[in-house]
UniProtKB/Swiss-Prot annotation:
Pathway recorded for this protein: Cofactor biosynthesis; biotin biosynthesis; biotin from 7,8-diaminononanoate: step 2/2
Biological process terms in GO annotation: biotin biosynthetic process
Positions with a binding annotation for [4Fe-4S] cluster: C66, C70, C73
Organism of this sequence: Histophilus somni (strain 129Pt) (Haemophilus somnus)
Record: residues binding [2Fe-2S] cluster: C110, C141, C201, R273
Stated name of the protein: Biotin synthase
Gene (name only): bioB
């Protein structure tokens, strides 16, 4: 049997100086499965403690009623999915949830708001929330949509650590998934976030009827961001009745693991997070993802409005795999 050796260009220095063409990334996807996982595991061990997992908790602080038409999203006002609209929550309620998350081992508290982008009056409330959560000693992350000029600086001044702004899918597949914004709109906000000095959390979703080449295009687009994102969430589509993608073709589990491995190889210093879709993954599949370089999960029974594995189940799985929550001491 011929073993294919992956040529990893200088382990992709950070910030990004190596251009990853779609063809180059597609070639990684086509590497024999176990060889690909092995190579990704080697890259992982050069930059991270392979026995630790970074735990984040995600809370929806403003739910439903979004004017966007993202085909995967149950929070769009255009679809009938049963999601109950909820205005921006009060500071006290959010802080209480953040305290619970910290007590259960989360090191980062992520907050999501379902809108196209915040208005100036929303930013005033959000900065108050960020300051209160930071006072608990947690890292903070926000996903608030497209930002106007100056907003990223206000969030940074309030103490926000990370801004999540996913590019969703490959540029070539974008219009098949979203019609109310362009791929460049996402890049524009990412540029504002970087300019303000915030860390970037940026990933995408697989299983949206894209081709393997389009999955390669997603990873190439992420890997070519300069600098590369500090955090890369890889989501498996959660199919929700009422959304246009409710009947999307099922993605084979090995293809998802390949995506994790390719993300790890092309972005060696980024945290690669198992995000939405874990509820439908077996323990064995998740273990393979960790082997392939995933080193972060969303921890808690809910991801915005979709179900996530229960914390007890995650603790049991981590114990089986001899994995520990990441801390400053064991990084």
């Amino acid at each position: 049997m011929t073993i294919i050796t992956i040529n990893i260009p200088s382990l992709t220095p950070h910030p990004c100086v190596e251009y990853w063409s779609v063809c180059k990334v597609e070639a990684l996807f086509e590497t024999p499965f176990l060889e690909l996982v092995y190579q990704a595991a080697q890259v992982h061990r050069k930059h991270f403690n392979p026995q630790t997992i970074q735990l984040s908790t995600l809370m929806s602080i403003k739910t439903g009623g979004c004017p966007e038409d993202c085909s995967y999203c149950p929070q769009s006002a255009r679809y009938h999915t049963g999601v109950q609209n909820q205005q921006l929550l009060c500071v006290e309620e959010i802080v209480e949830k953040a305290k619970i998350a910290k007590s259960r081992g989360a090191g980062r508290f992520c907050m999501g708001a379902a809108w196209r982008g915040p208005k100036p009056k929303d930013i005033e409330k959000i900065t108050e929330i960020i300051k209160a959560v930071k006072d608990l000693g947690l890292e903070t992350c926000g996903t608030f949509g497209l930002l106007q000029d100056g907003m990223a600086e206000e969030l940074k001044e309030a103490g926000l650590d990370y801004y999540n702004h996913n590019i969703d899918t490959a540029p070539e597949h974008y219009k098949e998934i979203i019609g109310t914004r362009d791929f460049d709109d996402r890049l524009n906000t990412l540029g504002k976030v970087r300019k303000a000095g915030l860390k970037v959390c940026c990933g995408g979703i697989v299983g949206m009827n894209e081709t393997r080449k389009e999955r390669a295009g997603l990873i190439a687009s992420l890997a070519n961001l300069d600098p590369q994102p500090e955090s890369v969430p890889i989501n498996q589509l959660v199919k929700v009745e009422g959304t246009p993608l409710a009947d999307a073709q099922e993605l084979d589990w090995t293809e998802f693991v390949r995506t994790i491995a390719v993300a790890r190889i092309t972005m060696p210093k980024s945290y690669v997070r198992l995000s939405a879709g874990r509820q439908g993954m077996s323990e064995e599949m998740q273990a393979m993802c960790f082997m392939a370089g995933a080193n972060s999960i969303f921890y808690g029974d809910k991801l915005l409005v979709t179900v996530n594995p229960e914390e007890d189940g995650d603790q049991l799985l981590m114990a089986k795999l001899d994995l520990k929550p990441e801390t400053q001491e064991n990084k």
